Amino acid sequence: MKKLFFFLQFLFHVSLSQEINWSTLYEQENSTSKINFIGTSNSEIFMLSQEGKGLFSSTKKYVLIFDNNTLLFKNKVPIEIENNNQLTYLKCLIINNQLHAFYSKQVQEKSEIYSKILIDQKWGEAKLLCTVPFIESSQINLKYFTTINSLFAFGVRKNELKKINEFCALVLNYNSNSEHIFCAELNSENANLDFTEAQSDTCCNIVLLANYFQKKSFNLNVAIEIPVAIKLTIKNSECKIINLKSLDASNEFSYLINSNQAILLNRENGMPEISFVNFDNDNTSQVLFNSSNSQPTEKEEDYAIEKSSRNTLYEKDFKNLKIKNVFRQKDSSITVVCEQSWKEQICNTLNYRFGGVQCFDYFYSWDVFVFYFSPKGELQNMNRFQKPQVTIDDGGVYNSIVCLQKNNDVLILYNNEPSNLIRKSGKLKTMMYPMSSVLHSIIVNKNGLLNSQRLSNPKEDNAILRPLKTHYINSSEALVLATKNNKFKIGKIKI
C-alpha cells in the first residue's frame, strides 16, 4: 500500500511537471487575413499580417507588436515602391531589435534588393542593399531563406552566352552589406529546381536541399525527380551540386540536421525508407528505417482486422508515412516524428423507418509515429498514437500537427474532438462534417506518452482550428499559429 502511494505521488508529480499552459495573444476573423512572419526580440513579439490575395496587392498590411501578452502596436505597413507589380516579397527579420522587411524589384535584367526598417514603431526610408545581375530575370523564380548572418536569395537563370541553365544564389550579409553570388551549371536545358530548405553553420558553409526536375528528352512532358543538395562555401567561393540517393525518383521529404547532414524520406516499391546522408563523406547514405525489412508481411485478409484491436504493425501501416519533424538531441540521437493516414469506409445502420445502411468514405485513420534512433543510426524505439481524421469542405483534412522540442521530449500539437463525432460501442459515427474542434497536446519520449492535455474550448472557438506554425520565443516558451479559413488565432504556450 505504501509503495502504491509513492507510485501515485510520482505519477501526479510527473503530470504536473509536464503541464502545458496556453494563453491567447491575438485572434482575428477575416477571410483574407494571413500571418506572414512571426519573430521575437527581447520581450517583444513581432507579427506581419496581411489582408488580400497577395502581400503587395492590398494596402491592408499590418505590423503587430506585443510586449509579453499585451498588444502594444498595430499599424499599416507602407512598404510599396513605385509599381507594386514589380515587387517580390523576400523576408522579414529582426536585426538588432529592429524589424527589417526585405523585398526586390526587377529592373530589366537585374533584381534590386531593398530593405525597410521599423524604428520606434515608424518605418524608415527604403534602402537599396544590392543589385543582382541575373540574366533574363523574367525567367527566374526567386526564393529566399535566411541563415545565421545572411539573407539567402536563389533561383534558376538561363545563360544565353553558354546556352545552359544555371542555379544562382546570392548571399547577402546584412551586417556588413557584403555580397557573394554563386552559380552552378544544371545538367539539362529543361531542368528546374523545387527548393525545400536551407541551413548554414557558424563559419562559411550553406547547404540547400532541392528536388531537381529534369525533363526526359524523348518526352518533355515527363520529368525525372532527383533530390539534390547544393553546398555553398563562402570562404572559397565554391558552389557544388550533390546528387542524393533517389529511389523510384521520389524524394518526399528532406530535413537538414546541420550543414553536413540530412534526413531523407524516399520510397522503394511504394514503401517508405528513412535514410541519413552525410555530405562531407562522399555523400554516404545510411538507412535508418525500412518498413518492408522491419515489419512482418501479412496477407490482405489478415490486414483487414479492426486496427484498434491489434498490436502488430504490418507493412501497410507505413505505406503513406510522411515526416513532419526531425530533432537532433544533445547526445546526437535523432527523433523523427511522422504521420500516416489512409482512407477508410465506415458504414452505419440507420434507425430510419425504412431501415438501411449508410456508408461514409471521408473518414481516415490518422496515426502519429515517433521514431528514436541512436547516434549510430539504430532504431531504439517507436511510439504510435492513433486518432480519427475526417476530410472537410474547406479543401483540407481534419487533423493537422506541429511539433516542438522540450528538452529530450517532443511536444505534438493537433486538433481533436470534433463536436459531432460520437463514439458508440467503440466505433465512430457521424451524420455531417465536423463543425468545431479543440487544440490538444501530447508530450512523448522514447518511454511513451508523458502527458495528454486539452488547450482550447470548442464552444469558444466555434471552428476547426488547425495548428500551422510554431516559433520559439525561448527555451521554455513558443508561439503557435492556428487557423481555419476565416479565422486565425495566435497563442503562447509555456513548455
Model-inferred region functions:
Residues 61-67, 114-120, 166-176, 222-236, ...:
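Beta-propeller blade signature
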Residues 243-252, 291-305, 383-400, 447-472:
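Conserved blade-ending motifs and adjacent loop-strand segments that build the rim/top face
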Residues 30-37, 84-92, 134-144, 190-198, ...:
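Repeated scaffold domains used in trafficking and secretory/extracellular systems
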Residues 1-23, 495:
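Bacterial Sec-dependent N-terminal signal peptides
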Residues 32, 39-42, 46-145:
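Post-signal peptide N-terminal segment of secreted/secretory-pathway proteins
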Residues 43-56, 98-105, 149-160, 205-214, ...:
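Short beta-strand elements that form the blades of beta-propeller/WD-repeat-like
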Residues 50-57, 156-164, 211-224, 339-362, ...:
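Short, conserved, GDST-rich strand-edge loop motifs in beta-rich repeat architectures
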Residues 334-342, 366, 395-450:
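Loop/turn-rich, solvent-exposed surfaces of beta-rich toroidal or solenoidal domains
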